[in-house]
From Swiss-Prot:
Keywords: Glycosyltransferase, Membrane, Signal-anchor, Transferase, Transmembrane, Transmembrane helix. One of its GO terms (biological process) is glycosylation. Belongs to the glycosyltransferase 92 family. InterPro entries: Glyco_transf_92. One of its GO terms (cellular component) is cytoplasm. It is a single-pass membrane protein. It is found in: Membrane. Its main location: membrane. This is Glycosyltransferase family 92 protein RCOM_0530710. Its EC number is 2.4.1.-. Residues 277-520 form the GT92 domain.
């Protein structure tokens, strides 16, 4: 009897454990099946820093979506910049692929979206740095993106204000980090005490145990030069998509940052047999919605000796992309750099100077409505050599600007600004500069019109009989009124504001409203000047078609 009871006990024990094993197997199988079907893809922490919430597409319409994410969002005064990350294998999307979606900040889900708008534009060709520009969100609303193809909403990333932000950074060839920052409101044209600030590197600046700190070498305007920690330099290729850099005023908090130092600037290319750089003469410019004027500006300057153009695009919404592509197809050496930052022209010019330094002997910093004019017919390169031969230490030519008026016109001249506008003010206004980027002061201080130079270098004023700038400043009203939108320079007051109304940057007598005066077409006309017009018609006009190259 005892043996029988023992056998029954063993049988029940075996039954219990077999049943339990079967149930657990079913549970694990079910969980595994549902996890494969519904679990969202985890964005790799290598690509997505720990400080940022994982922001993948959330949709019930399709289980197989690429893990597109919003890295961060920056609120500008008139629009929103949304920085989008893609998987490396994904194609770049276009403006037509996205909708900007707006939802109440009290919403608990993106499904409660209350408003959709098309993006203003989409910029960038890098899967880690594409920018979708959305219309500004209404008060009380947040903004995110929807991928139209599958109805997928993308969770919003961290949001920052544009006026208190570290927005760009690059590691220079001397291994320092050049950082571009808004929020300190430093005065123009002045170097500040670097010991009051420090540089901060890390994934999450809120976790002070996991950040690196380094000394500020110099700080002026919106440009900070930092001593880069060795651990950042030694692991640069591994961490440059994750590590951020920021600046802290000692005793205060660390500024928000979206700036990743990125790949170190390339060292200068191998020089030629005589030590020349690839290009003798280059131009940097910053523009917004100037696509229709760009062909004339590039083609003309190419003929007088400019070899390379750096275009900094400040949130254009015209067809600037296609214009630049057509110029590239025509063998012009031109590149577009997206520079979305508001009132940051000085910083943009400094950024451009660093990029051009290894490629260009001389760089001119002018606008698209400004044209170098050589009254004697010299080539620009020859004129620069002529004007800078007073010593090896000349590193900047300051070129006087003549301001042209509407010249009696009421519509945009069909043959271009150089032919259409022929009447100007008698005396020059201000100047613009051609500089040797190698000779710039390490602070990169500039006031748009000229730079600070290193010790031992000097500037000269160009002879107005040899080299001047025709500035087509006061064009027909439909073009000129765009200047009221916003001035791009950091230290220049927007024209709608009452401050500094008497500035030379403004048009005399216009006030703060974009209202066309009845006599606008006849203003700013003191001297007839057809010098550049005559040269254009003589050297550029096709005798068979009577067309200029930029009209084709």
């Amino acid at each position: 009897m005892k043996d029988r009871r023992r056998r029954e006990t063993v049988s029940w024990n075996r039954f219990f454990w077999c049943t339990l094993l079967l149930v657990l197997s079913c549970v694990l199988f079910t969980a595994s099946t549902f996890r494969e079907k519904f679990q969202p893809e985890i964005v790799s922490a290598w690509r997505q820093p720990a400080m940022e919430a994982t922001t993948t597409i959330m949709s019930t319409n399709s289980p197989a979506k690429p893990s597109i994410s919003i890295r961060e969002t920056v609120m500008l005064p008139d629009q929103v910049l949304i920085f989008v990350n893609y998987p490396q294998s994904s194609r770049l999307f276009t403006k037509e692929d996205f909708s900007c979606v707006y939802f109440s900040r009290n919403s608990t889900s993106l499904s409660e979206t209350q408003l959709k708008k098309p993006p203003n534009q989409i910029d960038g060709t890098d899967v880690n740095n594409q920018i979708v520009r959305c219309p500004l969100n209404p008060r009380g609303f947040s903004v995110s993106l929807e991928l139209k193809s599958g109805g997928g909403y993308i969770n919003p990333g961290p949001t920052h204000r544009w006026d208190s932000l570290v927005y760009e950074a690059m590691i220079d060839r001397d291994n320092t980090t050049v950082v571009f920052v808004k929020g300190f409101n430093l005065r123009a044209d002045r170097i500040y005490n670097a010991s009051k600030f420090e540089c901060v590197y890390g994934w999450d600046f809120r976790k002070t145990k996991f950040v690196l700190r380094s000394n500020v070498i110099s700080i002026a305007q919106e440009i900070v030069r930092c001593q880069t920690p060795l651990s950042i330099l030694n692991n640069q290729l591994k961490v440059n998509n994750a590590i951020k850099v920021s600046i802290r005023l000692k005793g205060k908090g660390t500024l928000h940052s979206i700036a990743r130092p990125g790949v170190q600037l390339l060292t200068d290319p191998e020089p030629g047999l005589r030590g020349e750089k690839p290009h003798e003469m280059c131009i940097c410019t910053m523009l917004r919605n100037q696509g229709r004027f760009l062909k004339e500006w590039v083609m003309y300057h190419s003929q007088i000796g400019v070899e390379r153009w750096f275009i900094y695009d400040n949130n254009s919404e015209d067809d600037i992309d296609s214009v630049i592509e057509s110029l590239i197809d025509a063998k012009f050496n031109i590149s577009r750099h997206v520079w979305p930052w508001v009132k940051a022209q000085e910083a943009g010019f400094a950024h451009c100077a660093l990029r051009a330094r290894g490629l260009c002997e001389w760089v001119g910093f002018i606008d698209v409505d400004e044209f170098f004019h050589l009254p004697t017919g010299l080539n620009l390169q020859d004129a620069v050599k002529n004007q800078s031969n007073s010593g090896n230490n000349v590193a900047e030519l300051r070129v006087s600007c003549h301001s042209f008026g509407p010249s009696g016109l009421k519509h945009v001249p069909a043959q271009g600004v150089t032919v259409g506008y022929t009447c100007r003010m008698m005396l020059p206004e201000r100047h613009k500069s051609i500089v040797k980027p190698e000779a710039l002061n390490s602070t990169l201080i500039n006031v748009v019109h000229h730079f600070h130079l290193r010790d031992g270098f000097r500037y000269v004023n160009a002879d107005k009989g040899i080299l001047v700038i025709n500035h087509y400043k006061y064009q027909v009203w439909e073009v000129f009124k765009e200047k009221f939108y916003r001035r791009v320079a950091t230290y220049v007051v927007d024209w709608q504001n009452e401050q500094n109304v008497g500035s030379k940057d403004r048009a005399p007598g216009l006030g703060t409203r974009a209202v066309e005066p009845p006599d606008w077409s006849s203003r700013f006309c003191e001297v007839s000047d057809t010098g550049l017009r005559d040269r254009i018609l003589q050297n550029f006009l096709d005798p068979l078609t009577d067309l200029l190259p930029w009209q084709i």
